[in-house]
């Protein structure tokens, strides 16, 4: 929005030309989202406390979590607000990739909001019925994927980028829609499963978003895309603004979500952020890179799948409790130790993922 305004004002003052620089807009996008999140934090927490929107804690969970009962939840609203405002201010409104991310972010946020509302207001511990949650998540994911396929069919938009192989970029055809669906829905649920400890989900989200900001910049730059042997996508550059907004909003939220948390993001935040990371990976053609950089989310999800599968097939559990972060809690690890170690692993995986762009 401000970019368009600056383009009209630059004829009166050349200094407005700075708004056309992607690097400048990426920095101010991060700062804008950060300050909005920090400003909203105390007000949001006070409002949630007044409304008695407190966290519901399972009785069969770790005993250390009982003290979290009643902590304000649905704080993801301030994350989404900060991201959306920052993106609308600093990204080109005409960029279709930006709108794809916003559709998934807001759509999944609404689904998460309904789920949280049923849990904390109606006191329904199950929240939104699972089949309806997956139905609406699927509708959004398939709608966006199908639209992208129609526009980018038989172009680099629908190619699959395979790590370590610079000349292996097969056209996916209709499989593109199916892959995109699983990436978007899967990442949304993966981040949701990871959001079980104070700050555990938000920091890996920040790391992955920061990594994708660098990838988006390279993908939207023809010279760097050719140098790294990745598809050049002319709309990808504006995703830098989206990614830095996620980083800023996430850091602002972490200020209040760090142990011991003053507020939790709830499903409204975790589903939306996960969905956003998923669609960003799809738009950049870096689904494999998401698996590497978002390895913490992948392991958390696999731990649940293995736990459920093992119990149904063998009647035995693999972990003391799933997702796996609860397993380490029950082994006696203090919560901050689990959180920080998962952060360190996440940062390492993002750096490894970025390194794969050059190792081809």
Curated annotation (Swiss-Prot):
UniProt superkingdom: Bacteria
Keyword tags: Cell cycle, Cell division, Cell inner membrane, Cell membrane, Cell shape, Cell wall biogenesis/degradation, Magnesium, Membrane, Metal-binding, Peptidoglycan synthesis, Transferase, Transmembrane, Transmembrane helix
Pathway: Cell wall biogenesis; peptidoglycan biosynthesis
Any single GO BP term: cell wall organization
Membrane-topology descriptor: Multi-pass membrane protein
Positions of transmembrane segments: 26-46, 72-92, 94-114, 132-152, 168-188, 199-219, 236-256, 263-283, 288-308, 338-358
Class of the enzyme per the UniProt entry, highest EC level: transferase
InterPro entries: Glycosyl_transferase_4, PNAcMuramoyl-5peptid_Trfase, PNAcMuramoyl-5peptid_Trfase_CS
Membrane topology (Periplasmic): 1-25, 93, 153-167, 220-235, 284-287, 359-360
Pfam family, one: Glycos_transf_4
Subcellular location: Cell inner membrane
Protein family per UniProt: Belongs to the glycosyltransferase 4 family. MraY subfamily.
Protein name: Phospho-N-acetylmuramoyl-pentapeptide-transferase
Provenance organism: Salmonella paratyphi C (strain RKS4594)
Gene name for this UniProt entry: mraY
């Amino acid at each position: 929005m401000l970019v368009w305004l600056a383009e009209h004002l630059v004829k009166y003052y050349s200094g407005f030309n700075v708004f056309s620089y992607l690097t400048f807009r990426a920095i101010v996008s991060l700062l804008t989202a950060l300050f909005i999140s920090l400003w909203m934090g105390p007000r949001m927490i006070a409002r949630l406390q007044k409304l008695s929107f407190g966290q519901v804690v399972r009785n069969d969970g770790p005993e250390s979590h009982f003290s979290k009962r009643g902590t304000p939840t649905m704080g993801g609203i301030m994350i989404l607000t900060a991201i959306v405002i920052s993106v609308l201010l600093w990204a080109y409104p005409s960029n279709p990739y930006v709108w794809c991310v916003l559709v998934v972010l807001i759509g999944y946020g609404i689904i998460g909001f309904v789920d949280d509302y049923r849990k904390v207001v109606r006191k329904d511990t199950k929240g939104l019925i699972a089949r309806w949650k997956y139905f609406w998540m699927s509708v959004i994911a398939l709608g966006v994927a199908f639209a992208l396929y129609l526009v980018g069919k038989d172009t680099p938009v629908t190619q699959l980028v395979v790590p370590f192989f610079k000349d292996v970029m097969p056209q996916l055809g209709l499989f593109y829609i199916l892959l995109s669906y699983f990436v978007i829905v899967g990442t949304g649920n993966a981040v949701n499963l990871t959001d079980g400890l104070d700050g555990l989900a938000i920091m890996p989200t920040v790391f992955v978003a920061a990594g994708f900001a660098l990838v988006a910049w390279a993908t939207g730059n023809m010279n760097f895309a050719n140098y790294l042997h990745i598809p050049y996508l002319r709309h990808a550059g504006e995703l830098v603004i989206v990614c830095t907004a996620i980083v800023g909003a996430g850091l602002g939220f972490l200020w209040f979500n760090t142990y011991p948390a003053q507020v939790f993001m709830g499903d409204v935040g975790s589903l939306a952020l996960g969905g956003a990371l998923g669609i960003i990976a799809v738009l950049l053609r870096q689904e494999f890179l998401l698996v590497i950089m978002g390895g913490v989310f992948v392991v958390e999800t696999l731990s649940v799948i293995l736990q459920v599968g093992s119990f149904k097939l063998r009647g035995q559990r693999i972990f003391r409790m799933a997702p796996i972060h609860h397993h380490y809690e029950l082994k006696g690890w203090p919560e901050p130790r689990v959180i920080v170690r998962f952060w360190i692993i996440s940062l390492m995986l993002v750096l490894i993922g970025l390194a794969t762009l050059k190792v081809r």
